[in-house]
Amino acid sequence: MSTIWIAIAALSALALAFGLVLGYASRRFEVENDPIVEEVEAMLPQSQCGQCGYPGCRPYAEAVALNGENINKCGPGGEAMMLKLAEKLNVDPQPLEGDADVQAPARQVAWIDESNCIGCTKCIQACPVDAIIGSTKAVHTVVSDLCTGCDLCVAPCPTDCIELRPIAPTPANWKWDLDTIPVRVIQVERHA
């Protein structure tokens, strides 16, 4: 019985010693991160889709914060996220595609033709934001509120039953073209 207690005490002392050494090493060799990079990364949608030309949201955040990369390359974040980045970094807002003459594309979401879906789950595995629900050998469907339109689920589908479709306009996502609305000032005559 005493050998068990000796073994427990020895392992506990060893664990304590390793814990102290690792704790000291983590404090001593800590790498300082740029807080601006952390804030920019927190603002990005974290879909890791690669539409910006970088392998994920962290490298894009580093390029924006440290190298002055354009803030208009994140497709899933859209115009709202670009405006937040512009305000945070004190830069001028940029058109989403980088060209003022090009109209920003309508937001699209994945759509699954459920009559052709074989339930292989390849699209579920490819989706970085878990916007596709379903199980093996069952029909899958897309939760359009979660879908970022990154297009990563389309290629793995063996039956080509997934396509991107534009979102139908609703009062929540409608963009008013304020330039075409005529504004007239009507003079009011006051009678005494």
UniProtKB/Swiss-Prot annotation:
Where is this protein primarily located? membrane
Q: Which Pfam families match?
A: Fer4_21, FeS
Self-association state and partner proteins as the record states = The complex is composed of six subunits: RnfA, RnfB, RnfC, RnfD, RnfE and RnfG.
Q: What does this protein need as cofactor?
A: [4Fe-4S] cluster
Which family, according to UniProt?
Belongs to the 4Fe4S bacterial-type ferredoxin family. RnfB subfamily.
Q: How is the cofactor bound?
A: Binds 3 [4Fe-4S] clusters.
Biological-process GO terms, alphabetical: electron transport chain
What GO molecular functions are on record for this protein? 4 iron, 4 sulfur cluster binding; electron transfer activity; metal ion binding
Q: Report the PROSITE patterns cross-referenced here.
A: 4FE4S, 4FE4S_FER_1, 4FE4S_FER_2
Cell compartments where the protein resides? Cell inner membrane
Natural source organism: Pectobacterium carotovorum subsp. carotovorum (strain PC1)
Q: What does the record give as EC number? A: 7.-.-.-
Q: Residues that bind [4Fe-4S] cluster 2, according to the entry?
A: 117, 120, 123, 157
Entry's Gene Ontology cellular component terms: plasma membrane
Describe the location of the 4Fe-4S ferredoxin-type domain by residue ranges: 108-137, 138-167
Looking at the record, the residues that make up the 4Fe-4S domain are 32-91
Q: Would the keyword Transport turn up in this protein's UniProt record?
A: yes
Taxonomically, the superkingdom here is Bacteria
Q: Which NCBIfam families match?
A: PRK05113.1, rnfB
Q: What is this protein called?
A: Ion-translocating oxidoreductase complex subunit B
- Residues bound to [4Fe-4S] cluster 3: 127, 147, 150, 153
Annotated spans, Hydrophobic = 1-26
